[in-house]
From Swiss-Prot:
Major site of localization recorded for this protein: membrane
Thylakoid among keywords: no
Entry's family note: Belongs to the GPAT/DAPAT family.
GO BP annotations, alphabetical order: CDP-diacylglycerol biosynthetic process; fatty acid metabolic process
Organism of origin: Yersinia pseudotuberculosis serotype I (strain IP32953)
Protein name: Glycerol-3-phosphate acyltransferase
Domain of life of the source: Bacteria
Pathway where it operates: Phospholipid metabolism; CDP-diacylglycerol biosynthesis; CDP-diacylglycerol from sn-glycerol 3-phosphate: step 1/3
EC nos: 2.3.1.15
The keyword Membrane is assigned to this record: yes
Record-linked SMART domains: PlsC (SM00563)
GO-annotated molecular function: glycerol-3-phosphate O-acyltransferase activity
Span(s) of short sequence motif HXXXXD motif: 304-309
Protein location: Cell inner membrane
Gene: plsB
Amino acid sequence: MSGWRKIYYKLLNLPLKLLVKSKVIPADPVSELGLDPSRPILYVLPYNSKADLLTLRAQCLAQDLPDPLIPLEIDGVQLPSHVFIENGPRVFRYYVPKQESVKLFHDYLDLHRNNPALDIQMLPVSVMFGRSPGREGHGTPHLRVLNGVQKFFAVLWLGRDSFVRFSTTVSLRRMASEHGTDKTIAHKLARVARMHFSRQRLAAVGPSLPARQDLFKKLLASKAIEKAVADEARSKKISHEKAQQNAITLMEEIAANFSYEAVRLSDRVLSWTWNRLYQGINVHNAERVRQLAQDGHEIVYVPCHRSHMDYLLLSYVLYHQGLVPPHIAAGINLNFWPAGPIFRRLGAFFIRRTFKGNKLYSTVFREYLGELFTRGYSVEYFVEGGRSRTGRLLEPKTGTLSMTIQAMLRGGTRPITLVPIYIGYEHVMEVGTYAKELRGAIKEKENLLQMLRGLRKLRNLGQGYVNFGEPLPLTTYLNTHVPQWRDAIDPIEAQRPSWLTPAVNDLANQIMVRINNAAAANAMNLCSTALLASRQRSLTREQLLEQLDCYLQLMRNAPYAKDTTVPDKTPEELLNHALNMNKFEVEKDTIGDIIILPREQAVLMTYYRNNIQHLLILPSLIASMVMYHRRITRTELLHKISMIYPMLKAELFLHYSKEQLPETLDTLIDELARQQLICDKGSELVLNPARIRPLQLLAAGVRETLQRYAITLSLLSATPSINRGALEKESRIMAQRLSVLHGINAPEFFDKAVFSTLVATLREEGYISDSGDAIQEHTLEVYNMLSALMTPEVKLTIESVSMPAETSNQPEAPETPETPETPETPEPEGKTES
């Protein structure tokens, strides 16, 4: 590089250092994209911009990547280490420099032809200053190719809203070996790079935004809404104009009013907020979503719903991953001043709790959703319908998902892909409110005062987690499961073919399973799981560390799913982090520390335990079986677990099929044996007395679930003809009684939805006949197996209410060996806080 050019770059770099603060996508390109800094890298940029080049250089040096300003010297030939695909517009249009990208690609390919050991990494990089999509009819957006003067003002105004996006590398060795090294291949490389950058720009900014009134006019002109308006006028005996005005009022209520400037401002506010409230936001598997957007997919984000924070957190994360924040389906309860107008500008569109009896509303909403898909906007909705009060996934609400498929049946949309997302927190700001609601308190209506009270309480929220699950392409799903689905395409009438409901139900279940597959274990939910497993909610520091190590080894060596994330920290680091969250108490004595979960915190901590209960449920069940039997064959263990696995699968959205269960259990047994929690004697599994404490704590993780199943099965066995409503009601009443007598502090223990799911599963599995009567010999077999795993006191409580005398005389379980922290008979602790 000449001396004059060095001076020029140094002078240009001075204002850039002051004005530009760019974000890197992905955050760690070396590890996430598999870059090898020791091998030569050719940086490929979309168009000639020295500001872009110097912005890239700053990030390369920060990431320990080669300097793009230093030429590559290979076999005595010196070539630039960066290339611009296009020259871009000039201030003085009469001067157009020669395009050098094709020549440079050809020179590099020639080097590979002459040097078989050479393999240069071609690394595409986009540098973006601002990401406004622009308005329809208002010219081109800010992300267009800019000349020098325009670039100056873009840097001046948008330098703090800039992104450096690294893409997956292309091996020039592979290109040379597979396609040759002539100029045709060089031209093809340049052409493919242009297409890549064009798609990347669209994925980053999205389509142009319509004027709101223009959108309403287009919706009003649709055949479906025209018909609904006519029906409204006829059924309510009002004028056509009045019915049309009703439709416009509904559009005003529903539609978002997306503003890029609002997104930019909120990004500043949220960046400041997250940095003060959270110790970090952990994001996993975002690259798969970036690739979907770049491939032109219409993306529908379907996260689990933990908190009102979810709306803001997911949009913030997507924006920082170089993606367009989605249009978000928000409950109408959030449409209050000032939150409603703010959320609208951030992409929220509002949805009522129910559409029943309002055909005009359902038609307007469905057409609006379809228009979002047609225009290419990404959409987000919570398939659970509301926030989980227990920390578990709720049964999915399928209305919006059904409308998504109906939008496909209008024809003309891009391929729609559902992206399940697990959102997790070490502290959920509403968790105290959830506990009150589960105890029977009436849900407060959202308002400004409630929002301010919530904000006042925000502090020390620990870590946040956003894990993108395995995408579910709708076209692929329908082609596989409903090959004839295209026969139902109709651009006017909303279609409800016979296959729609079963397909939607199956899709909803798959989404929930994939959300759980992407779960994030963390310090808070692991420590809560261990302490709640102890009947006195306390463990010595050594015992707690031992149990954390047991959980971590299980999750690392026998992972639940490939998308599940497990902390890479040691048990000591996790415990220290959890203690800093001020949820637990530490009592010190001359022997050592005792970690205590205070009574008032216990019911709140079940929320975090429930976030990951599905990850440990099968190891807990194996431990429980071995604890009771002391010696059990693998075959017998598989038979017993197979009897209740369908109930666990339905309740916790587990991903293992019945066919996968034997292999899964073998893997878990091998890991438990490796940890010496049990002894593997070949065909038999034997209790290891030396490691009974961690095994007992592990077994406790499934205790309350099995007790709940036993309650329902005991009622079915005692009264086979009991109807479904009565069965669910009686089960809840008995569960409440059990929780009072035995101090069970689990809010979901007598949750209505849990019993409803259980009864539905029993019917599907054949325990309840088509006539509605229980098949007593089947229910008794499972009940006897479950009751054997309980303490005599719990079993007696259940049978004293439900079981007839002749069925309750089963042999009692032998006493479980005691350990200091888990006495055999718990003291009643009063009414449960649930």
